[in-house]
């Protein structure tokens, strides 16, 4: 007996990240190879023709799991009964634009989308914000959806997590799949703190294996933090395929579980690790039965505290920068 289809809403559906994302969702990479999906695609009125072109390609793949597609410029149509909402679309920073202007432009988008989710989405909707500034956009959406549980709102730090995994594998010579217990703390921005103090590869401590404080401080942390900029520099375009891959990883693990393995998600703080409540902050989590659970009780040394507080300061500044826009 086929499972009932799940509704997956994707915003920014005509964009580059969505182009790398939609075919994989339709192929079963997001929710499982036995789970039919209905894609509900949102983009601006002027992008509707482009979205139709993408849907023609989706049709031409004849995906067995794709049970339907909705194309719209109305958030209330896109989010209707959505089980998963991938908020990919955001206002990009244009030349000469101040960060506060970027925050305001996105606050407008994410208050509207949060309110629409509040009104029409499934009460168990799993929301992942990919569009930057992702943590603060997720915070705005969460605050605009008072009737939905706060825990439903997450921000994507999985790209940073995957970038850090790849750097650690290259440095240690260990297979990337063998690395466990990596954490990335804070904001999805260059201030984030990738932390491998607890990490192991094939049961060995990575800290002992690598044993190079200077590399951690001067190479590893900045490389992970500035990787997005390095890709733009090299490619002339932002990292779309790797971002889409990270979004798939994030939601798949949230829905299907991590078997006790740590992954990083930006989630609303409960006050632990000295992070004020409700701030959407990257922390290590495990996932089981469709729920994430933060890894608790990790020791925070002086260097880590400084890094964690630095990225928190940026998040607090962003929160305060949009406070007047939230009712």
UniProtKB/Swiss-Prot annotation:
GO terms for molecular function: L-malate dehydrogenase (NAD+) activity. GO terms for biological process: malate metabolic process; tricarboxylic acid cycle. It is an enzyme of class 1 (oxidoreductase). Substrate binds at residues 93, 99, 132, 163. Keywords: NAD, Oxidoreductase, Tricarboxylic acid cycle. Its EC number is 1.1.1.37. NAD(+) binds at residues 12-18, 106, 113, 130-132. InterPro entries: L-lactate/malate_DH, Lactate/malate_DH_C, Lactate/malate_DH_N, Lactate_DH/Glyco_Ohase_4_C, Malate_DH_type2, NAD(P)-bd_dom_sf. Coiled coil: none annotated. The keyword NAD applies. The active site is at 188 (proton acceptor). It holds the Pfam family Ldh_1_N. It catalyses: (S)-malate + NAD(+) = oxaloacetate + NADH + H(+). It comes from the Bacteria. Belongs to the LDH/MDH superfamily. MDH type 2 family. Catalyzes the reversible oxidation of malate to oxaloacetate. This is Malate dehydrogenase 1. It comes from Burkholderia thailandensis (strain ATCC 700388 / DSM 13276 / CCUG 48851 / CIP 106301 / E264). The lineage of its organism: Bacteria, Pseudomonadati, Pseudomonadota, Betaproteobacteria, Burkholderiales. The gene is mdh1.
